[in-house]
Amino acid sequence: MIYIRKLSILFGLVFGLIVITFSNIVAEQQESNAEIADKGKLITEIYGCVDCHTPKIKEGEFLVNDPDRLFSGHPGDNKLPQFPPEIIGPEKWRGLFTDSMTAWGGPWGISYSANLTPDKKTGIGKLSEKNFVSILNIGIHSNMNRKLMEPMPWKEISELKDDDLKAVYQYLKTVKPVKNKVPESVPLHNHENLAQIQD
């Protein structure tokens, strides 16, 4: 009877140690994930991702990022901006952007900042970490039909280490999902259709 009780105590101690060890591993992992997301946030700030992918609101005399629409891209419910045809096309090295700083026109065509929130229908919610990193490595849009367009500095971003891009992905998964379907960008090779698209 004493022998069985000793075994029970020993088993309890071993089980307790396993639980404590596992809890510590989980806590360290959670802390590590938080640190990775913090690193990703810092990278998005350094590269100005939040400024180009967040619509602006007026605050006094200044345009500031709308905190309710962080990383949600060009507002899909806005009327498409009118860009003068003289800035679109080869050798026309001028550009314009809208007040929201989420729509851009220039020699590359017309581009709209993407929705980078984790919304599953209109953002990157269904995009895997692997695909996210691949898109930024090779500069191909997620629909695989075209390259990422200016002024997105994807060539500079592609030089980041994969771990840095993974950190950005982990951070973006923590921001508030915003349902916002961004208009399709129009590459230069489609510039003959721009007038129709802007009507």
Regions found by a protein language model. Name each.
Residues 36, 48, 112, 128, ...:
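Stable alpha-helical elements in mature extracytoplasmic
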Residues 2-12:
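Bacterial N-terminal signal peptides that target proteins for export
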Residues 32, 54-112, 141-199:
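Flexible coil segments in periplasmic/lumen-exposed cytochrome c-class electron-transfer proteins
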Residues 27-45, 57-62, 81-82, 122:
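Electrostatic cytochrome c docking/interface patches
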Residues 134-142:
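Glycine-rich, acidic and aromatic/proline-enriched surface loops and short helix-turn segments
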Residues 40, 46-56, 132, 168, ...:
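The canonical Cys-X-X-Cys-His
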Residues 10-21:
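Bacterial N-terminal signal peptides
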Residues 109-115, 119-126:
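Mid-length scaffold segments of soluble, non-membrane domains
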